[in-house]
Amino acid sequence: MFSALTDITDQIDPKFVISYWIPAVVAMSGGGMMWSMMTDFDFWDVWANSLDGVEQIVLAGSMVGMPTILAFFLKAVRRPILMLFMGTSLPRPVAEWGIRRQMRAKDNAYQMILTSEEQDRQFFINKAHQTLERRFPESSARVMPTRFGNVTANLEEYTRSMHGIDHWLWWPRLAPLLPEPMAEITATEVANTTGLLNLSFIGAALGLGGAAMLGLGGGLWTAALKVLVVGLVLAWICYRMAVAQGAEAGRHMHAAFDLYRHEILKQWGLDVPGNREAETALWEDLSRQMLDRSFRAPSTSAAANTAADIAQNGPAPGQKTVDVSRQPTS
C-alpha cells in the first residue's frame, strides 16, 4: 500500500498540478457550486458544522482526494481531448466548415500585409508574419479545422521542411536526450498548454452540463443562463490562451530539433552527415524505414513460399491442407 502511495505521489509534480490537478479542482468546485444552487446553501452549512473532528478530517481528505482522482482521469484521456481541440475527431461537415474559416483567417493575414498603410506597414507586416509563422502551416493543404490544430500542423511542418524529420515520430526519441535546461523549458511549456486546454474543456462542460442541470433539472433558468455564459466565456478565454501558449511551446520544440537532433543519431551509432542535403536524406530514409515497420501490410511472400514447399515436398507431419478444387463455388 505504501509503495502504491509513493508511486502516486511521485507523479504529482508541479507540471502535473498545472496540467491536470488545477483543472480538476476547478471542475469539482464548479460542480459543487451548481449542486448547491439546486439545493439549499444553509443545509450544507448546517451539515458541515454538525460533523465531529474525525468526520471533518475525512471530508477534508475527500476534498483533496477526489480532485486528484479526476486529475489522473484527465491525464488518462489527454489524447482524446487533444484530438478534439486539434479538430481531427470532428464530424466531417464541421471539420470542412472549420477548414474554410481557418483558410479565410490565413488569407486575412496575407491581406493585412498587402493593404496596410505605408506608415503602419512594418508593424502590420511583423504582426501578420508572426501569425503566419507560428500559427499556420505554410501549405494550404495542411490547414486544420481549428486554431490549435494549425499550431500543431505548423509544428510538424517546420521539422519536416527544415530537417526532413517527422515531428511526431521523432519527438519521443529526442525528448529523453535533451539536456536538463531545454527539457525543463519544453516540458513546462507543454504543461502550460495542456492545463489551459483542460480548463477550456472543463469550462465548456460545466457551462453546458450545468445549464442543463439547473434549467431542466431545477427549473432555475436565470441561473442556468448565467452558468452557460460564464462557462463558455471561460472556455473561450482558456482556448485562446492555449493557442498562444501552444505556439510558444512549438518554438521551443523547433529549437530542440535544431540544436539536439544529432543526439539521436549518436545514440543509434550513426555518423552525422557532413551537409544538410545528406542529413535530410538520412532522416527521411530512417523515417521511412520506421513507418514501414510500423504499418507494414501483411506479406503474401511467406504464404506463397509455404504453398510452394507443400506442393514440392508434401505437407509436414500433422499439417493439414485444403483441396481448393473440391471447395464449393458461388
Over which residues does each language-model region extend?
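Hydrophobic alpha-helical transmembrane segments
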Residues: 48-66, 210-231
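Membrane-proximal, non-transmembrane interface segments of integral membrane proteins
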Residues: 79-201
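Hydrophobic alpha-helical membrane-associated segments
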Residues: 62-73, 230, 234-245
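Cytosolic/matrix-facing juxtamembrane and C-terminal tails of multi-pass cellular membrane proteins
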Residues: 1-17, 234-330
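Cytoplasmic juxtamembrane interface segments
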Residues: 1-11, 129-137, 227
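Transmembrane alpha-helical segments and their cytosolic interface motifs
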Residues: 7-27, 163-226
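Juxtamembrane/interfacial segments around transmembrane helices
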Residues: 65-72, 109-119, 251, 255-257, ...
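N-terminal first transmembrane alpha-helix
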Residues: 1-116
